[in-house]
């Protein structure tokens, strides 16, 4: 294989590489064997057409595309490795020449990892808003949240107020015509929860069981269902029940209901204070780490960050998010309808965070390289065991999912973060 690289612009260039006849022949054989079972030829059983007959009848060139798909990934990776390039996005592949009996020549437009010029990243002085202190109010607020969680809904005779739950039937229409998804029976709606479009819940405040209420609203311009976006709608709503929350008394019995390991309200307060102090300390340490890393990134200069890196990170984040939604039984279409957002909105939502994450990773990688951090065999083994414990899976399964290079990279990154944070101080 011969390879060359022509620089076209900062972090951009073209790789030209060849594929040998030996590798081409193997790829052509694989391509032929893949389709052989479906081939017919006079005098031969189906799937037994000899290669020379195929070449004479169809021409070997018809196999070139499949053969290229077979041989290209390995050839491209070998070219990148030989040239010592750090490619960060999918290449644009073009065929330069594919002549019978000769080496194939291809080109790949690539984007390479940008240069990072490090600034100060040790002994940084940072400011954080977080505090390790836990007040009595913090403890009381945690108990109050648990108290509210134990509240029961009871039937209310009077008018519905904010925070009450109404059980309703509703039928929606636009210009007198009902629309899909605009109808519901015995639906429990907490007033003030924001479950329905703006203005709907407010118009049910003051209603009583048995009332029929005409609710008039306008769908937001950004509503997912384009045929409803910006349109005025009317919902004929029947109130079946009004329910209000009944919260338990703040006493020792409540404390035991919240946590069976305590006997009194005072015991619960002591326990919650310890839990909150531990959580606050973790949050404080995380805030210091985040501020120190952010300052280290700000002190560095990334030379012409390729936009492709941001796009790939956005796509990765969006795909991960939508995958989580689908595992919960929510399709992309359902998600966008429920939230009144679009695919573009979701991409925009992740763009700023993607930009920050890419820059942070580049700077931390540069620090790891500057410090000469590497992972030892024992550190790799410890990382595997830690991941196995964290995700409750066998260590061998972790080994099969993560390559040694990935583990070495992650360990080096952790060491770089430790250098930043362990030397930082708070102003």
UniProtKB/Swiss-Prot annotation:
<dbReference type="Pfam" id="PF05698">
    <property type="entry name" value="Trigger_C"/>
</dbReference>
<protein>
    <recommendedName>
        <fullName>Trigger factor</fullName>
        <ecNumber>5.2.1.8</ecNumber>
    </recommendedName>
</protein>
<keyword id="KW-0963">Cytoplasm</keyword>
<keyword id="KW-0131">Cell cycle</keyword>
<dbReference type="InterPro" id="IPR037041">
    <property type="entry name" value="Trigger_fac_C_sf"/>
</dbReference>
<dbReference type="GO" id="GO:0044183">
    <property type="term" value="F:protein folding chaperone"/>
</dbReference>
<dbReference type="InterPro" id="IPR027304">
    <property type="entry name" value="Trigger_fact/SurA_dom_sf"/>
</dbReference>
<keyword id="KW-0132">Cell division</keyword>
<dbReference type="GO" id="GO:0043335">
    <property type="term" value="P:protein unfolding"/>
</dbReference>
<feature type="domain" description="PPIase FKBP-type">
    <location>
        <begin position="163"/>
        <end position="248"/>
    </location>
</feature>
<dbReference type="Pfam" id="PF00254">
    <property type="entry name" value="FKBP_C"/>
</dbReference>
<dbReference type="InterPro" id="IPR005215">
    <property type="entry name" value="Trig_fac"/>
</dbReference>
<dbReference type="GO" id="GO:0005737">
    <property type="term" value="C:cytoplasm"/>
</dbReference>
<dbReference type="InterPro" id="IPR046357">
    <property type="entry name" value="PPIase_dom_sf"/>
</dbReference>
<dbReference type="InterPro" id="IPR001179">
    <property type="entry name" value="PPIase_FKBP_dom"/>
</dbReference>
<comment type="similarity">
    <text>Belongs to the FKBP-type PPIase family. Tig subfamily.</text>
</comment>
<dbReference type="Pfam" id="PF05697">
    <property type="entry name" value="Trigger_N"/>
</dbReference>
<keyword id="KW-0143">Chaperone</keyword>
<dbReference type="InterPro" id="IPR036611">
    <property type="entry name" value="Trigger_fac_ribosome-bd_sf"/>
</dbReference>
<dbReference type="InterPro" id="IPR008880">
    <property type="entry name" value="Trigger_fac_C"/>
</dbReference>
<keyword id="KW-0413">Isomerase</keyword>
<comment type="function">
    <text>Involved in protein export. Acts as a chaperone by maintaining the newly synthesized protein in an open conformation. Functions as a peptidyl-prolyl cis-trans isomerase.</text>
</comment>
<dbReference type="GO" id="GO:0051301">
    <property type="term" value="P:cell division"/>
</dbReference>
<dbReference type="GO" id="GO:0043022">
    <property type="term" value="F:ribosome binding"/>
</dbReference>
<dbReference type="GO" id="GO:0015031">
    <property type="term" value="P:protein transport"/>
</dbReference>
<dbReference type="InterPro" id="IPR008881">
    <property type="entry name" value="Trigger_fac_ribosome-bd_bac"/>
</dbReference>
<keyword id="KW-0697">Rotamase</keyword>
<dbReference type="GO" id="GO:0051083">
    <property type="term" value="P:'de novo' cotranslational protein folding"/>
</dbReference>
<dbReference type="GO" id="GO:0003755">
    <property type="term" value="F:peptidyl-prolyl cis-trans isomerase activity"/>
</dbReference>
<dbReference type="GO" id="GO:0061077">
    <property type="term" value="P:chaperone-mediated protein folding"/>
</dbReference>
């Amino acid at each position: 294989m011969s390879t060359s690289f022509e620089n076209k612009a900062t972090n951009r260039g073209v790789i030209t590489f060849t594929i040998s006849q030996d590798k081409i022949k193997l790829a052509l054989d694989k391509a032929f064997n893949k389709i052989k079972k479906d081939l017919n030829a006079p005098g031969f059983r189906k799937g037994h057409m000899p290669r020379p007959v195929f070449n004479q009848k169809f021409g070997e060139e018809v196999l070139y595309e499949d053969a290229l798909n077979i041989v290209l990934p390995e050839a491209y990776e070998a070219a990148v490795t030989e040239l010592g390039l750090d490619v960060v996005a999918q290449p644009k592949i073009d065929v330069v020449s594919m002549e019978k009996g000769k080496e194939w020549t291809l080109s790949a437009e690539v984007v390479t990892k940008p240069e990072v010029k490090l600034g100060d990243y040790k002994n940084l002085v940072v400011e954080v808003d977080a505090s390790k202190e836990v007040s009595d109010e913090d403890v009381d607020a945690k108990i109050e949240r648990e108290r509210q969680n134990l509240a029961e809904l009871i039937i209310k005779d009077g008018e519905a107020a904010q925070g009450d739950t109404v059980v309703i039937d509703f039928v929606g229409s636009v210009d007198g015509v009902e629309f899909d998804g605009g109808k519901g029976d015995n639906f429990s709606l907490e007033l003030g929860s924001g479950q329905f479009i703006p203005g709907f819940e407010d118009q049910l405040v003051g209603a009583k069981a048995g009332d029929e209420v005409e609710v008039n609203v306008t769908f937001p311009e950004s509503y997912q269902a384009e045929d409803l976006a910006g349109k005025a709608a009317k919902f004929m709503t029947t109130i079946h029940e009004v329910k209000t929350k009944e919260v338990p008394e703040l006493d020792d019995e409540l404390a035991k209901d919240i946590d069976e390991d305590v006997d009194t309200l005072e015991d619960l307060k002591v326990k919650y204070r310890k839990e909150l102090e531990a959580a606050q300390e973790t949050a404080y340490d995380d805030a210091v780490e985040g501020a120190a890393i952010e300052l280290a990134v700000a002190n560095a200069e990334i030379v012409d960050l390729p936009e492709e890196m941001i796009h790939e990170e956005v796509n990765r984040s969006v795909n991960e998010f939508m995958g989580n939604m689908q595992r919960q039984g929510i399709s992309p279409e359902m998600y966008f309808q429920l939230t009144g957002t679009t695919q573009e909105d979701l991409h925009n939502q992740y763009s700023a965070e993607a930009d920050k994450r890419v820059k942070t990773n580049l700077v931390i990688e540069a620090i790891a390289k500057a410090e000469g951090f590497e992972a030892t065999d024992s550190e790799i083994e410890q990382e595997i065991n830690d991941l196995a414990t964290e995700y409750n899976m066998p260590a061998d399964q972790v080994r099969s999912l993560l390559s040694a290079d990935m583990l070495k990279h992650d360990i080096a990154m952790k060491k770089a973060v430790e250098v930043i944070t362990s030397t930082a101080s708070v102003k």
